[in-house]
């Protein structure tokens, strides 16, 4: 026993095995004030994280990244900020042409840091992500941090609601999956594509989407698989695909050393993020099934028990090529489950992006993160930050096509155009229509 305690205290075991931390079930949080969130969406200050060689001409490409290590608290994680770093590096490497993004992490030294991932900031920036979206726009959302659950009240299809856990959750509370659906999915118009990645515990149904692949560790063993309907409602005009680190009852591992995933970065990270980014970089023309076969196989080989999940607003044909652009290719055998009004045509085909060429990783390894606040208190530095804290906007340049960004709202003097960064400065390692129907709780 003494020997075992010595090993645990030295941290050797944590470096060898996945570390899973949790916050336990939480008190049911307050509902999000959606109208207020969308009124404040224009206060967000997006940036351009890098320049892709081939710009996307079909619309805007907006992205939101949230990584929370909860540094200095009893629920501290070690790899969530690195997950954001890894995801940004992967998207850059595959030349995903982000036109504007916001980065919420609890490390102010992170390049292009936008704001701390407090409850207020996460909600406001999620509203920014979907505010004023139009057909052809492409959205990407990545969250790495704690996930938890709370007793469901009005949901007849599950006993517990899933929640995201902001930095200040102990004071301000978590964010319900009901509100995540209302914020991110419900009001998307036809022709908008969203891909979301949740690397956290209890994450399979965080957006409460109607279709899911509910699988187990035998998925890679062969046979044909398909999605199934898991909810009677919650349809959307937009096309939404969600990759989750585990099922609703499962935990998502925080890995102390991710070099075994082949990323080259000796640091911490979420197992699901590491496996998914590896699959995206090391395969081309892969299908949804390919991603899951490879991701689950990687995690299984490394000794992880978590099983990544897939959910969507429409039944995905798992054997069609995966893309971050364009409409979901619907499994025709399941299309009758989707109400006709949610199957509007998309219009012209989306442009094809060739597989990326091999590149060297750009983003420097992270520096050791120091606690910014005592474990027993709220983040003290947040109290001194203005609600609009982040990267100030700069005037537009000739490199930003006219009309690519929405018109400035009152008080926004720079046209809502993200700042332009030199190609060697920001590189990375490996709405009124929307509010229609608001006020109808699930």
From Swiss-Prot:
GO terms for biological process: proteolysis. It comes from the Eukaryota. The active site is at 146, 201. Keywords: Calcium, Endosome, Glycoprotein, Hydrolase, Metal-binding, Protease, Signal, Thiol protease. GO terms for molecular function: cysteine-type endopeptidase activity; metal ion binding. Changing residue 201 to A: Loss of catalytic activity. Belongs to the peptidase C14B family. It comes from Trypanosoma cruzi (strain CL Brener). Activated by Ca(2+). Its main location: other. Residues 1-18 form the signal peptide. The keyword Glycoprotein applies. One of its GO terms (cellular component) is recycling endosome. Residues 348-442 are annotated as: Disordered. Its EC number is 3.4.22.-. The keyword Transmembrane helix does not apply. Residues 422-434 have a biased composition (Polar residues). Glycans are attached at residues 69, 112, 234, 257, 282, 331. Residues 372-382 have a biased composition (Low complexity). Cysteine protease that cleaves specifically after arginine or lysine residues. May play a role in apoptosis. It is an enzyme of class 3 (hydrolase). Residues 19-62 are annotated as: Important for catalytic activity. The gene is MCA5. Gene3D superfamilies: 3.40.50.12660. This is Metacaspase-5. The lineage of its organism: Eukaryota, Discoba, Euglenozoa, Kinetoplastea, Metakinetoplastina. Residues 348-371 have a biased composition (Pro residues).
């Amino acid at each position: 026993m003494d020997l075992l305690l010595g090993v645990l205290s030295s941290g050797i075991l944590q470096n060898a095995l996945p570390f899973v931390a949790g916050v336990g079930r939480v008190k049911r949080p307050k509902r999000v004030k959606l109208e207020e969130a969308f009124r404040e969406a224009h206060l967000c200050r997006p940036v351009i994280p890098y320049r892709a060689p081939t710009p996307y001409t079909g619309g805007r490409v907006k992205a939101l990244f949230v990584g929370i290590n909860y540094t200095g608290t009893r629920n501290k994680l070690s790899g969530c900020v690195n997950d954001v770093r890894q995801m940004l590096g992967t998207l850059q490497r595959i030349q995903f042409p982000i036109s504007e993004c916001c980065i919420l992490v609890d490390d102010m030294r992170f390049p292009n840091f936008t704001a701390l991932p407090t409850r207020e900031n996460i909600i406001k920036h999620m509203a920014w992500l979907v505010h004023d979206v139009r057909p052809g726009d492409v959205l990407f959302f990545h969250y790495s941090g704690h996930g938890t659950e709370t007793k469901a009240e009005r949901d007849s299809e599950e006993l517990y609601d899933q929640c995201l856990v902001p930095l200040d959750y102990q004071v301000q509370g978590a964010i319900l999956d009901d509100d995540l659906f209302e914020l991110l999915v419900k009001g998307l118009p036809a022709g908008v594509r969203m891909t979301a990645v949740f690397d956290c515990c209890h994450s399979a149904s965080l957006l409460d989407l109607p279709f899911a692949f509910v699988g187990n560790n035998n998925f890679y063993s062969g046979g044909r698989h398909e999605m199934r309907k898991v909810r009677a409602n919650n349809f959307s005009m937009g096309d939404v695909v969600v990759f989750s680190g585990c099922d609703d009852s499962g935990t998502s591992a925080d890995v102390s050393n991710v070099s075994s995933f082949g990323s080259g970065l000796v640091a911490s990270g979420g197992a699901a993020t590491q496996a998914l980014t590896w699959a995206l970089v090391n395969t081309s023309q892969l299908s949804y099934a390919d991603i899951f076969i490879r991701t689950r196989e990687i995690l299984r080989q490394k000794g992880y028990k978590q099983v990544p999940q897939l959910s969507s607003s429409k039944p995905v044909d798992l054997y069609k090529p995966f893309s971050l652009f364009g409409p979901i290719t619907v499994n025709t055998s399941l299309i009758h489950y989707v109400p006709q009004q949610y199957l509007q045509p998309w219009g012209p085909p989306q442009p094809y992006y060739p597989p990326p060429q091999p590149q060297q990783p750009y983003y420097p390894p992270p520096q050791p993160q120091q606690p910014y606040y005592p474990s027993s208190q709220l983040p003290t530095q947040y109290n001194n930050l203005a609600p609009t804290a982040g990267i100030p906007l700069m005037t537009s340049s000739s490199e930003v096509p006219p009309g690519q960004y929405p018109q400035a709202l009152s008080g926004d003097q720079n046209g809502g155009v993200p700042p332009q960064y030199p190609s060697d400065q920001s590189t990375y390692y490996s709405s009124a229509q929307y509010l229609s129907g608001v006020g109808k709780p699930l």
